[in-house]
Amino acid sequence: MKIFQAVAITILAIAGTSAQGDAGWRQPFDPLRIVGNIYYVGTRGLSSFLIVTPAGGIVIDSGERESVPFIRANVERLGFRLSDVKILLAGHAHFDHVGGHADLQRLTGAQVIVMDADRDAIATGTDRSALGAAGWQKVRVDRVIKDNDTVTLGGVTLTAHLTPGHTQGCTTWTTDATEDGRRFHVAFVCSVTINDGVHLVGNTRVPAIADDYARTFRLLRDLKPDVFVAEHGSVFGLEEKAKRAVAGGANPFVDPEGYRQFVEKSERAYLTQLRAEQGK
């Protein structure tokens, strides 16, 4: 982002360093089917997902503002129209996942639906999380939801699970998809990493952050999806699985064991940091 290149705002750049990504954030990535009616339409490093229904599309995550042209191109390459997107969702309120929301909303007229705990951040374009990184364009929020609320379009229903920690309103979405006559439970997992410089003990921005993460891992252990994806491709092995998908054979995104390992590894990292901060 240009904002991080300006010497005059070095302090802001330092604050957002852990939220910045590598060059892959702004590199194209071929769109592909994840499972059933669910497609990957993001960049190499920032995930965006398109869920196709008879009544139009649902997009989860808009990446940075610079991601929007890539998302649009990928949607069209799949044979769909961006103007058919009716609902815009998000995993959480950080600039690399909602930075393109305002532009996508203008381009599509889509209804923006957000978790209540991230509503103010998304609407004002201000990072209210423990990270406190760069902001984004203000977004008109059309509907505010709470934990376990559902969003339905064209017979497809997604359930919103509040999984706080990374942000206060971090949302893991679940739905079902059918492929080759089989039904798969799918989870779009919100980020569970702890950004560099964020403390779990004595955090003045988000005092309950340690308890938030603990709640999240309890919930994630119980989800048990067949297919899991996340807000950065590296988290769920996007590139390797995409190569296997192109080669044919069994759908590589059907990976319940990979999900279990992901949750265990992420929780271990959280507990390691928590114990270190507690001096244990």
Predicted regions and their residues:
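Active-site environment of divalent metal-dependent phosphoester hydrolases
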Residues: 67-68, 93-99, 119-122, 168-171, ...
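Metallo-beta-lactamase
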Residues: 20, 27-29, 33-35, 84, ...
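Bacterial N-terminal signal peptides
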Residues: 5-15
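Conserved beta-strand hairpin/beta-sheet module of binuclear metal-dependent hydrolase folds
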Residues: 24-78, 82, 173-194, 199
